[in-house]
Amino acid sequence: MTEQGPATHIEDPSCAVAHGAVPPPVRERTLVAVFASPVARYLLQYGQDLGFHPILVEPDADRRAAFCQGQSPFRDAEFLKAVPELDGSADLVATDHHRPELGLQLRDALRTEARWIGVLGNPRHPGPHIEMLRELGVADPEVARVHRPVGLNIGSRTPPEIAIATLAGLLADRNDRPGGFEF
């Protein structure tokens, strides 16, 4: 109640989510994590919560089995040996830049129509994927499609923090926003 009369609530569609009305995703989204790792686990788990269809690509059968072992938090996830055919709804993140299969996995990803391809790694060091891809005969314009670093610069140190920063960066890019605190 105010001095002028009863307080009224003004309906604003931008507040719908805060009040429990969750709209369906605007379009199908796929998130591919290449290589089983702690970051991949959080990336796919949080990504699924954000409406992405989760896919893990792990060429090593033992690592793939270990990742899938036990209680899986993933619904309808795919666990594959190689990068599948991807369309423009897919974002792919290589979660281990030390793996010898990195170049081959990225080359295969670059042959798809994936919307976004990135490799985790410290931005102060050159990405090993560049030389790997060149040795495989991948042209420089294609190599340049691979983003590194990935995610927003929030000082991430732990696997969950890295996953959050990565997903925030992907969402900002998908929504044509710079990320950060400016609205």
What would you call each of these model-derived segments?
Residues 1-72, 91, 125, 169-183:
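Segments forming oxygen-rich coordination pockets for charged ligands
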Residues 44, 105-106:
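Generic hydrophobic/aromatic pocket-lining and core-packing "Φ" positions
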Residues 71-76, 135-138:
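Short, hinge-like loop/turn segments at secondary-structure boundaries
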Residues 91, 107-132:
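ADP-ribose/adenylate-binding Rossmann-like module
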Residues 94-96:
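Short, well-ordered coil/turn residues at beta-beta hairpins
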Residues 99-103:
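Cytosolic regulatory regions of ion transport systems
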